């Protein structure tokens, strides 16, 4: 296995009776990147991650972590020492403070990490002596991430780290994940939030019903599957566009939209309407949500359900 590859998966398959949860998927995760596994609930994300974390045994396929084959049971402890895990539904002790919780888990893992330093790294200094029960959802997620860092792992698994958080807490958690990447962590992220995957990931693997649908960087997926760029014009004199041979589609009496492929076409449109003081302009760029819709024919709601 190449030196910079942390996870190597080839032909991974896992079934439960007649149900195929993971169907012959293959991918690599590189050192130092944020790798997102994206899909709705039931897509096979959790099963895949639990196999990599040595919690489940695959039916078929090769799984190597840090160059160690998971079939070598004697070396699974070595793998576990190098990984940190924050499951979606992690537990901490309600009536212990942040510091007391982290002290407990440090002793449990027999770690030498400084709890005070960890609290500082994770941005919880002001909550050091606050009971876990009193924390906001975003602060509780930070505690979960801190617990996953107790053993100073090289590879960090974050399972739906912002599920249920409000927009501000979600963005604060994103900033923390970016900071962890800057510190050299390899991060394996499972999420059903398109914006989250687009914001954080170096590479994304989209799976549906246990099968890989597409993979690539956010920009590659958007470029290949996101559809056309468009410009929306409100209160525009359509005669101006017609004189310039610019084709448009009517949305409403006061709004039209124009699809364009490149900047030259965009500049032509803008030049035509720029002198009109009444026109309102909005440029719409394709995003990961549109790419996912075009790939799968469905969207994912906030509960992770395909619709």
Predicted feature descriptions by range:
Residues 53:
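Helix-to-loop junction immediately C-terminal to a conserved catalytic motif
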Residues 103, 107, 112-128:
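Conserved ABC ATPase "signature" region
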Residues 174-261:
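ABC transporter nucleotide-binding domain
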Residues 156-160:
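Catalytic Walker B motif of ABC-type/P-loop ATPase nucleotide-binding domains
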Residues 61-72, 78-79:
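Conserved ABC transporter NBD signature motif
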Residues 229-299:
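Short, charged/small-residue-rich alpha-helical element at the C-terminal edge
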